[in-house]
A protein has these predicted regions:
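Helix-loop-helix units of permease transmembrane domains in multi-pass membrane transporters
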Residues: 73-105
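Secretory targeting signals
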Residues: 24-66, 98-162
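Hydrophobic alpha-helical interface/terminus motif in multipass membrane transporters
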Residues: 74, 83-86, 118, 122, ...
Length: 200
Protein backbone atom coordinates (compact mmCIF):
# COMPACT_ATOMS: atom_id res chain seq x y z
CA UNK A 1 0.00 0.00 0.00
CA UNK A 2 2.85 2.37 0.75
CA UNK A 3 4.32 1.74 -2.69
CA UNK A 4 0.97 2.41 -4.34
CA UNK A 5 0.61 5.67 -2.41
CA UNK A 6 4.09 6.69 -3.59
CA UNK A 7 3.12 6.00 -7.19
CA UNK A 8 -0.17 7.90 -6.82
CA UNK A 9 1.74 10.92 -5.52
CA UNK A 10 3.60 11.05 -8.84
CA UNK A 11 0.39 12.13 -10.55
CA UNK A 12 0.37 15.38 -8.59
CA UNK A 13 1.31 18.34 -10.79
CA UNK A 14 1.94 15.89 -13.60
CA UNK A 15 1.59 17.08 -17.22
CA UNK A 16 -0.51 13.99 -17.99
CA UNK A 17 -3.50 15.80 -16.46
CA UNK A 18 -3.63 17.97 -19.58
CA UNK A 19 -4.06 14.82 -21.68
CA UNK A 20 -6.56 13.50 -19.13
CA UNK A 21 -8.71 16.62 -19.38
CA UNK A 22 -8.57 17.45 -23.06
CA UNK A 23 -8.14 14.20 -25.02
CA UNK A 24 -11.56 12.74 -24.03
CA UNK A 25 -13.32 15.94 -25.13
CA UNK A 26 -12.56 15.29 -28.80
CA UNK A 27 -14.17 11.81 -29.03
CA UNK A 28 -17.14 13.16 -27.06
CA UNK A 29 -17.53 15.94 -29.62
CA UNK A 30 -17.02 13.64 -32.62
CA UNK A 31 -19.35 11.01 -31.18
CA UNK A 32 -22.09 13.54 -30.51
CA UNK A 33 -21.80 15.01 -34.01
CA UNK A 34 -21.89 11.52 -35.50
CA UNK A 35 -24.99 10.72 -33.47
CA UNK A 36 -26.73 13.93 -34.55
CA UNK A 37 -25.90 13.18 -38.18
CA UNK A 38 -27.46 9.71 -38.05
CA UNK A 39 -30.62 10.19 -36.02
CA UNK A 40 -32.68 8.24 -38.55
CA UNK A 41 -30.60 5.14 -37.76
CA UNK A 42 -29.50 5.74 -34.17
CA UNK A 43 -32.84 5.87 -32.38
CA UNK A 44 -31.98 4.31 -29.02
CA UNK A 45 -31.11 7.74 -27.55
CA UNK A 46 -28.63 7.32 -24.67
CA UNK A 47 -27.42 3.88 -25.73
CA UNK A 48 -26.89 5.03 -29.33
CA UNK A 49 -25.03 8.12 -28.17
CA UNK A 50 -22.81 5.94 -25.97
CA UNK A 51 -21.91 3.69 -28.91
CA UNK A 52 -20.80 6.74 -30.89
CA UNK A 53 -18.74 8.14 -28.02
CA UNK A 54 -16.99 4.82 -27.38
CA UNK A 55 -16.44 4.24 -31.10
CA UNK A 56 -13.99 7.13 -31.13
CA UNK A 57 -12.63 6.97 -27.58
CA UNK A 58 -11.97 3.22 -27.24
CA UNK A 59 -10.05 2.76 -30.48
CA UNK A 60 -8.23 6.06 -30.88
CA UNK A 61 -7.96 8.12 -27.71
CA UNK A 62 -8.17 5.83 -24.68
CA UNK A 63 -5.34 3.52 -25.83
CA UNK A 64 -3.17 6.60 -26.30
CA UNK A 65 -4.08 7.83 -22.81
CA UNK A 66 -3.23 4.45 -21.27
CA UNK A 67 0.04 4.55 -23.20
CA UNK A 68 0.80 8.03 -21.87
CA UNK A 69 0.02 7.07 -18.26
CA UNK A 70 2.20 3.95 -18.45
CA UNK A 71 5.09 5.64 -20.24
CA UNK A 72 5.04 8.55 -17.83
CA UNK A 73 5.38 6.36 -14.73
CA UNK A 74 8.19 4.31 -16.22
CA UNK A 75 10.00 7.19 -17.93
CA UNK A 76 9.97 9.15 -14.67
CA UNK A 77 12.20 6.52 -13.07
CA UNK A 78 14.64 6.59 -15.99
CA UNK A 79 14.71 10.39 -16.09
CA UNK A 80 15.55 10.70 -12.39
CA UNK A 81 17.73 7.56 -12.15
CA UNK A 82 15.35 6.05 -9.61
CA UNK A 83 15.66 2.40 -10.62
CA UNK A 84 18.86 1.89 -8.63
CA UNK A 85 17.21 3.43 -5.56
CA UNK A 86 14.19 1.17 -5.99
CA UNK A 87 16.30 -1.95 -6.39
CA UNK A 88 18.31 -1.13 -3.27
CA UNK A 89 15.14 -1.26 -1.16
CA UNK A 90 13.83 -4.50 0.40
CA UNK A 91 11.02 -4.81 -2.16
CA UNK A 92 10.66 -7.09 -5.15
CA UNK A 93 10.45 -6.04 -8.79
CA UNK A 94 6.97 -7.55 -8.86
CA UNK A 95 5.83 -5.25 -6.06
CA UNK A 96 7.18 -2.22 -7.93
CA UNK A 97 5.37 -3.28 -11.10
CA UNK A 98 2.09 -3.91 -9.24
CA UNK A 99 2.28 -0.49 -7.58
CA UNK A 100 2.69 1.16 -10.98
CA UNK A 101 -0.10 -1.00 -12.39
CA UNK A 102 -2.59 0.05 -9.69
CA UNK A 103 -1.56 3.69 -10.04
CA UNK A 104 -2.25 3.47 -13.78
CA UNK A 105 -5.54 1.65 -13.13
CA UNK A 106 -6.52 4.49 -10.81
CA UNK A 107 -6.03 7.01 -13.62
CA UNK A 108 -7.98 4.81 -16.04
CA UNK A 109 -10.88 4.67 -13.58
CA UNK A 110 -10.96 8.46 -13.23
CA UNK A 111 -10.71 8.77 -16.99
CA UNK A 112 -13.79 6.55 -17.31
CA UNK A 113 -15.65 8.82 -14.88
CA UNK A 114 -14.64 11.87 -16.92
CA UNK A 115 -15.82 10.17 -20.12
CA UNK A 116 -19.18 9.42 -18.44
CA UNK A 117 -19.46 13.04 -17.34
CA UNK A 118 -18.82 14.28 -20.88
CA UNK A 119 -21.34 11.73 -22.17
CA UNK A 120 -24.11 12.96 -19.84
CA UNK A 121 -23.30 16.62 -20.60
CA UNK A 122 -23.41 15.89 -24.35
CA UNK A 123 -26.75 14.13 -24.04
CA UNK A 124 -28.27 17.01 -22.11
CA UNK A 125 -26.92 19.59 -24.56
CA UNK A 126 -28.53 17.84 -27.54
CA UNK A 127 -31.80 17.46 -25.65
CA UNK A 128 -32.10 13.78 -24.75
CA UNK A 129 -35.10 13.50 -22.44
CA UNK A 130 -35.05 9.78 -21.60
CA UNK A 131 -33.76 8.82 -18.14
CA UNK A 132 -29.97 8.60 -17.92
CA UNK A 133 -28.96 4.90 -17.66
CA UNK A 134 -26.82 5.32 -14.55
CA UNK A 135 -26.72 1.60 -13.74
CA UNK A 136 -25.54 0.69 -17.23
CA UNK A 137 -22.98 3.49 -17.15
CA UNK A 138 -21.54 2.07 -13.95
CA UNK A 139 -21.31 -1.40 -15.51
CA UNK A 140 -19.76 -0.10 -18.75
CA UNK A 141 -17.18 1.99 -16.93
CA UNK A 142 -16.29 -0.81 -14.52
CA UNK A 143 -15.67 -3.28 -17.32
CA UNK A 144 -13.92 -0.59 -19.34
CA UNK A 145 -11.56 -0.03 -16.42
CA UNK A 146 -10.83 -3.76 -16.20
CA UNK A 147 -10.16 -3.90 -19.94
CA UNK A 148 -7.93 -0.88 -19.61
CA UNK A 149 -6.04 -2.67 -16.85
CA UNK A 150 -5.07 -5.45 -19.25
CA UNK A 151 -3.85 -2.85 -21.72
CA UNK A 152 -1.98 -1.01 -18.97
CA UNK A 153 -0.08 -4.14 -17.92
CA UNK A 154 1.19 -4.57 -21.48
CA UNK A 155 2.03 -0.89 -21.85
CA UNK A 156 3.95 -0.85 -18.58
CA UNK A 157 6.03 -3.79 -19.77
CA UNK A 158 6.68 -2.07 -23.09
CA UNK A 159 7.64 1.14 -21.31
CA UNK A 160 10.00 -0.87 -19.12
CA UNK A 161 11.83 -2.32 -22.12
CA UNK A 162 11.79 0.79 -24.35
CA UNK A 163 13.32 3.89 -22.79
CA UNK A 164 11.61 6.09 -25.36
CA UNK A 165 8.46 7.81 -24.08
CA UNK A 166 6.81 8.03 -27.50
CA UNK A 167 7.36 4.51 -28.85
CA UNK A 168 5.08 2.68 -26.36
CA UNK A 169 2.44 5.37 -26.87
CA UNK A 170 2.64 4.78 -30.63
CA UNK A 171 2.28 1.04 -30.05
CA UNK A 172 -0.80 1.73 -27.91
CA UNK A 173 -2.31 3.79 -30.72
CA UNK A 174 -1.64 1.01 -33.23
CA UNK A 175 -3.03 -1.54 -30.78
CA UNK A 176 -6.22 0.49 -30.44
CA UNK A 177 -6.68 0.60 -34.21
CA UNK A 178 -6.08 -3.14 -34.48
CA UNK A 179 -8.65 -3.64 -31.71
CA UNK A 180 -11.30 -2.32 -34.07
CA UNK A 181 -10.44 -5.06 -36.56
CA UNK A 182 -10.36 -7.82 -33.94
CA UNK A 183 -13.71 -6.73 -32.50
CA UNK A 184 -15.28 -6.55 -35.97
CA UNK A 185 -14.10 -10.12 -36.67
CA UNK A 186 -15.57 -11.39 -33.40
CA UNK A 187 -12.23 -11.85 -31.62
CA UNK A 188 -12.36 -8.77 -29.41
CA UNK A 189 -12.31 -10.87 -26.24
CA UNK A 190 -8.95 -12.35 -27.30
CA UNK A 191 -7.09 -9.14 -28.14
CA UNK A 192 -5.84 -7.03 -25.19
CA UNK A 193 -6.27 -3.74 -27.02
CA UNK A 194 -9.93 -4.51 -27.77
CA UNK A 195 -10.94 -5.44 -24.21
CA UNK A 196 -11.66 -1.87 -23.14
CA UNK A 197 -14.07 -1.40 -26.05
CA UNK A 198 -15.45 -4.90 -25.43
CA UNK A 199 -16.19 -3.95 -21.83
CA UNK A 200 -17.71 -0.59 -22.65
Amino acid sequence: LRLIRCELMKWRRSPVWLAFLFLPILPALLGTLNYMGNLEILQDTWYSLWTQHTLFSCYFFLPVLVGIYSSYLMHLEVEHNNWNKYLSLPISKGEIFLAKFFATLWMIFFCELWICTLFVISGKIIGLIDPIPWQKLLIWCSFGTLGGGVMASIQLLLSLFFQSFALPVGIAFGGGLSGLLFLAKGFGHLWPYALMAYGM
